[in-house]
Amino acid sequence: MGSTKRMVKVSFTKMAGTGNDFIMVNNVKKLYNLDWQAFAVRFCPLKTGIGADGVIVLDEDTDTDFTFRIFNADGSEAEMCGNGARCAAFFAVQQGFAKNSMRFKTLAGIIGARIDKEDVAIQMTDPEGLEPGISIDVEDKRMSVHFINTGVPHAILFIDHIEDARVFELGRAIRFHNRFAPAGTNANFVQVLSQDRIHVRTYERGVEAETYACGTGAVASAIIAEHLGKVIGAPVHVRTKGGDLKIDFTRDGSRYSGVWLIGPVDTVFTGEVMVRS
């Protein structure tokens, strides 16, 4: 006779960081031994699950406050997620295993975070791979995009009227373009609003759709805009569909460090789901 899988009750909190929503699971005491990729595919859909851009699992770590893992709605595990990391920091304080200032481990490196009243700020890993002015052919047209990795890869396209951006169609074409194979890239559409403010819409790899916000995309867009002289210095204020973010950083030539992503986090609801283990 084959083994029978047992049902496990998983407690979760749904949180949102500027419109990016996540299913948060506290696993620092190793309560759950689950296939988190399958969990994300099962519960991220809105109509048949909880509804979220991804699942964030916080595991125990001996060197930092915890380990951060994020699984996209398609089940793929991402290296990092800016707004997800901000939610994780807030969630860790709520759950009582981190203080208002903390460090945690991600696949992209160690992240610092602090809780400042209504805002959660995370110190990102230093961006890499800055490459402005990449020419690619999309839909039989030549366009110039700019690339940077802010924990995950991002391509940036500046446009004059962001309301008219074909985020899904063009974003998907850029995301899967051979130039960025095999890992692919996120695609950001950016309109400059003033010398310290931009508006960003993002097609997210793994979600495979436009999201209300993308923290690493906001950081990537702000740094590229500053690098090209489209905004002046830091901080850069970023408008997204889900709300406003602030990006701070230090520049030394073409190197950027001390990068902070700052914005609000909301707890939406808590609940439990039954999962076969």
What are these regions (language model features)?
Residues 2-117, 156-277:
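A glycine-rich beta-to-alpha transition motif near the start of alpha/beta enzyme domains, typified by
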Residues 126-145, 172:
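Active-site glycine-rich loop that binds ribose-phosphate moieties when present
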Residues 137-166:
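Internal active-site segments that recognize and position negatively charged phosphoryl groups
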